[in-house]
A protein has these predicted regions:
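Cytochrome P450 fold signature focused on the C-terminal beta-domain
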Residues: 232-238, 295-315, 328-348, 357, ...
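Cytochrome P450 heme-thiolate monooxygenase catalytic core
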Residues: 2-14, 79-85, 103-105, 119-275, ...
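N-terminal membrane-proximal hinge/A-helix region immediately C-terminal to the signal-anchor transmembrane segment
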Residues: 2-106, 121, 128-133, 171-172, ...
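Conserved cytochrome P450 K-helix/beta-meander segment immediately N-terminal to the heme-binding cysteine loop
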Residues: 358-385
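Cytochrome P450 proximal C-terminal region
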Residues: 1-6, 11, 131-135, 151, ...
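Conserved cytochrome P450 K-helix E-x-x-R motif and the immediately C-terminal K′/meander segment
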Residues: 23-46, 219, 223, 305-346
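Cytochrome P450 catalytic-core helices
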Residues: 272-297, 407-422
Length: 463
């Protein structure tokens, strides 16, 4: 199932999961799904516009025209559904990431200010400082043994969220909170067969599967919110939520709702970014040409001193690499919606209540949408290249519910990758290429062990 097939264009092909050509029985697919969801897909998903393994199972849709309807034109007819709420409300409570309708609209408006491009660019020095500290630590540790960059990068992106959005998070213990978050994600990543194969309505009144791990995290966050109410404003995400007011009703957020939103942003804001960067680190190690080209770009744009907000837009090739990594390894490999009423999608009649799965991993490698889809080719995203169909490339979703932190995530990823390539040389220390495992996010099986050494010609990157 893990392939490194030769590219017809002679390009490097990194590890991938492509289901077998023969369609297994639906029960075989069911048995494969809990350990790696993509193993439960048919290869048809990579070739066709729509696929359904059995009459009562969810429909998998990859046709861009249908996806535009789902995410944009008819978005209100395709809500997130009961299964989504059951899986993610333990993490995000009643916050913007799981809210619907009017509750979603005003929370989204209140939160979006923190992620405006002008606001995000001001955070660059904090991102750079955290990354410089982390890379220095990785180089030192690697002198004794390989460093697993999967948890290391996750810790880096967690620290960045705390530094940039929570003004340093002095009201909780970072190590303790990160350990609790890791335990939470391990638990939420246990995929149940009912998630894949039972109708959405089945989940409407089922108990939350992960609530017991939520309370300790919320207690830390609520303590911070309570303390911040009596302190001068700092202009961070916490203050924006404290001041938020529904323009229609005048409603403000109580401590519980603020805590739900902060917890959601912490969880969504660092885990997904870290997964993409973990795969990007493998690209630097396995494809030295890419690492060298990024180094040369950084050398040209930033001859001395730290990377700044003004430099980031000039790191064009680095951004192309990030975009291509997110195509090949989208952290959110699967999006879900539910048909609120009977409709037709890509020629298939879909009854009301049917769950619609959007297999982003397959969409990004679809044989109809991409040339040489399994190959690594950052030139797809070059300024002079024709842009991909808006609904064939969904690293951050689409439509009204597109990830509001997309600009922050891209800036963070570009700055971290540029700093890492500038400062360090990576050598993959695993016995075999990492296998993508799709459970909660698209992670590498067995982590990402790396030897991290000082980059060639370090004087060129003096800070």
């Amino acid at each position: 199932m893990t392939l490194q097939a030769p590219s017809p264009d002679g390009l490097w092909t990194p590890p991938a999961i492509i289901p077998p050509e023969a369609d297994p029985h639906v029960l075989v697919l069911a048995a494969r799904s809990p350990g790696n969801q993509i193993r439960g897909w048919s290869r048809k998903v990579f070739y066709e516009d729509v696929w359904r393994p059995a009459p009562t199972t969810p429909v998998l849709v990859t046709q861009p025209e249908a996806l535009r309807r789902i995410f944009l034109d008819e978005a209100e007819d395709f809500p997130q559904g009961a299964l989504f709420r059951r899986m993610f409300r333990p993490a995000w409570g009643q916050g913007v990431l799981t809210a619907e309708g009017a509750a979603w609209r005003w929370q989204r408006h209140a939160s979006a200010t923190a992620f405006r491009p002008a606001t995000v660019s001001e955070l660059t020095p904090l991102i750079v400082a955290a990354t410089e500290r982390a890379v220095t630590e990785w180089i030192a540790k690697s002198a004794k043994a390989p460093v697993d960059l999967e948890p290391a990068i996750t810790r880096l992106t967690f620290d960045i969220i705390v530094d940039t959005m929570l003004s340093g998070g002095e009201y909780f213990d970072r190590d303790q909170m990160k350990a609790r978050i890791s335990a939470f994600f391990r638990d939420i990543g246990r995929i149940r067969l009912s998630y894949m194969f039972l109708p959405d309505a089945y989940h409407g009144h089922r108990p939350d599967a992960h609530s017991k791990l939520r309370e300790p995290l919320l207690a830390d966050i609520r303590r911070m919110v309570t303390a911040r109410r009596s302190l001068p404003a700092r202009g961070d995400l916490v203050d924006l939520l404290l001041a938020a007011k529904d323009p229609e009703t005048g409603q403000t957020m109580d401590d519980a709702l603020i805590a739900d939103n902060i917890m959601g942003f912490i969880l969504a804001g660092h885990e997904t970014t870290s997964v993409g960067l973990t795969w990007a680190s493998y690209v630097l190690a396995a494809h030295p040409t890419t690492a060298q080209r990024i180094r040369e770009e950084v050398r040209a744009v930033v001859p001395q001193g730290p990377i700044t907000a003004d430099h980031a837009p000039q790191l064009v090739h680095t951004r192309q690499v990030v975009s291509e990594v997110l195509r090949l390894y989208p952290p959110g490999f699967l999006l879900t919606r539910v048909a609120a009423k009977t409709c037709e999608l890509a020629g298939l009649k879909v009854r009301a209540g049917t769950r619609i799965n959007i297999p982003v991993y397959a969409l990004h490698r679809h044989r109809k949408r991409w040339r040489d889809p399994d190959a690594f080719d950052p030139s797809r995203f070059a300024p002079e290249a024709p842009p991909p169909d808006r609904y064939a490339y969904l690293p951050f979703g689409a439509g009204p519910r597109i990830c509001m932190g997309a600009a922050f995530a891209m800036l963070e990823s570009v700055v971290i990758l540029a700093t890492l390539a500038r400062r360090a040389d990576l050598t993959f220390a695993g016995r075999k290429p990492p296998e993508p495992v799709a459970v909660f996010a698209l992670r590498p099986k067995g982590g990402m062990p790396m030897r991290v050494t000082v980059a060639p010609d370090p004087k060129s990157y003096a800070t």
